[in-house]
Amino acid sequence: MSDDSSAGDADVDLPEGVERRTFGGRQRLSTRGAQVYGEPVDADGWRAWDAGRSKLGAMLELGMDTGLVGGESVLYLGAASGTTVSHVADFAGPTYAVEFAPRPVRDLVGVAEDRDNLFPLLKDARDPESYAHVVEAGIDCLVMDVATRGQATVAVRNRQFLADDGRLLMAVKARSEDVTAEPDDVFDDVVAELEPAYEILDTARLDRFHADHLGIVARPK
C-alpha cells in the first residue's frame, strides 16, 4: 500500500529532524538524508517518508504519541532493507538495526554507508543475547516491526536493552501470529502478553496504511 494521505494529525509534536513538507502539492512527513527507496527529495534535501511503506511512519501520521524527540539511541528489530530505519537514523542518535535475512542486510549495509550512526546487525531478534555484546545498555527506544509468530515474546526478551524511561514502539502484524484468527483477538492476546513487562501507553489500528496491523506505544515496568 502506498501513501496516498495528506497531512495527519498536525497537532502532535514530531521529533526534531522530522518535518511535514510539501511533495507533489501535499504535505508529507519527511527527514533529511540520502535517498534510499526512490522516495521524492526536495531541493533542501528532505525526503518524503512513505507511511504506506513504514509502520512507524504510519504511527506518526496517525498522531500516536511515540515519545520521540530526536537524538535518541534506538534498537530497531526487523530492519529489512532499511526503508524505515533509514528515516529513523536521519533524526536519531546511535541506531542498531537488527535483520536476520542476509539479502536485505546487504541493502542495509549500503544504506548505512551514508549514515555514520546506523549499525546493521545480521542477527535474529528472537535471540537478543547474540547481539547483547554490541548494543549499548539503556537504549531510549526499541522499535519493532518483526513479522513472525511470537511478536510479544520478542518484545519482552529485548526489554533488557531499554532504559527505565525508554519506549517500545511496536507494529503487530495479526496475520503473522495466526492467519485464521480475528485480528482484534490477536491484538488482545499480544497486549496481554506484553503487560507483565510493559505499561501500555497507546494503541491504534494502522489499517489506513497497513491492513491488520496494530501500533503499540509502551514503556518498561
Specify the residue positions occupied by each region the protein language model found.
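N-terminal auxiliary segments of SAM/dcSAM-dependent transferases
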Residues: 1-46
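C-terminal substrate-binding/active-site "lid" region of AdoMet-derived donor-dependent transferases
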Residues: 2-5, 12, 155-221
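Conserved alpha-helix/loop element of class I SAM-dependent methyltransferases that forms part
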Residues: 16, 51-73
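Conserved class I S-adenosyl-L-methionine
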Residues: 68-82, 96
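Residues at the starts of beta-strands that form the adenosine-phosphate
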Residues: 73, 93-94, 117, 167
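Conserved SAM-binding loop of SAM-dependent methyltransferases across substrates and taxa
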Residues: 81-92
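S-adenosyl-L-methionine
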Residues: 98-151
